[in-house]
């Protein structure tokens, strides 16, 4: 469709329009979006086509197909005309009154999703559905008698085409409904089809080693897994031979169980990624695979795709070998346990290799960061009680164990990327210099005066050094990340700017990332010199990569939406109370992040005259549980950054 719509910019004749687009052509004519001239159809001035993105606040952003528009067009909630997330729409440009170009939706050309979520509300004598994403009300295809039989506040899934009710998800007062809402808003599903479950169960729950005589048997090696404390899907296990200086990175061999174009594969492709909520994971693969036969559980034989990476005394890679193996992990660690071992008990004989590996990865990290960036990012961990109410939050920082695993995985991912010239790469482009220039202006207001220089890694390190002096490193790192482009998947290698790698891919998480599963299949086909299979696996690979980049962002949005809902429920119980917060956005809408006993919640401030990264005290005035928004006013300015 994108190609058809773009052709209207230059004119397209009637016979060039396929049957697929003739109805759309008629609708465009009826709405005066296009005109006919000498048997050719042209887009009228002032109209654009694009894909709609909608923020958590209900504001629309149109990603224009016309590449001359360098920035997304702002579409206010009232101008969405019923359009939803990822819909392809025709929009009319509005007179430029603000800095950001804006438009309003004229016609929805293609629905991205067949369904929407609404909550029942009374409007006068009638019960209507209010769209949870946009806040717009709509009449439902059901009798008022049946709608009034439902308690107000019932969450319904409806068809976008005719507003027919498909499913009752629950009631807004029930906190367990949040998970269903977050998944349904982005068209995600927790359940697997009967065909997927049947395929998964057919693999059994144990590995018979006698069936895999051609695999390298590494079961005697003392592999271990290191994961979060509540993890069930163990993708990777490691072992380091201290005498031979050989690092083994064993990855769950999912491709042995999930064949291309099988029912599970089609479902995994559509999901793209596992989604992680604080209380549960929504897996990419059925649980009999993700949490059982594929998971590298301790003391069980498991199939693994394993890199053996040999390092010299200077910690440089001298050899990389890839094998189909069978392993038996000897121990399952969580990160906290390994941190304690590395810091307090480095002399444990049975784990001496782990401590020596840690010393090596510290050197690897030091060498890598000469050409890469190190950001002090903090992952928000939310703890819920038995009723799924917010109990506490904590920001988890990188620890020695996290760094150890990260650098081992980077070695394997980098090694895998070297083996292919086309396939699945993880690319990260150099930063947009306009965004960097804007960042420098923002930092100047904080007292961080850094002059623009052509060497971007050097520039960022200068910024970080000054941020360290001001005690603002973590906050400034987030601004730097925001100014950079997002990493994406592509069939063609373009390097990874942030990591400083010429070539990079994702190999180490096939249980939770579809990109890694594709790469495993490609590598196996290449090792077997099966060119026919390799090319077969490459069919539509660029489209697949582009779709995976979209699915990755969606998976993040689902997780963030769920947390926003829990924060909003917490705020509703704390109306009128005061908390510390940090201003993280002050361009147009002013937003602060809660920085008190509860951390990380986005607070929309009614006050706009406030400095970026200023610490303030806020009083919660309103919590919208339906739209997952919190509103507050500033009661005290605790610190101005210019005085830091």
Regions from the language model: what does each represent?
Residues 9, 157, 181-182, 195-644:
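Electropositive polyanion-binding surfaces
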Residues 1-251, 255-301, 569, 606-617, ...:
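Charge-lined substrate channels and their catalytic hotspots, especially those that engage the 3′ end
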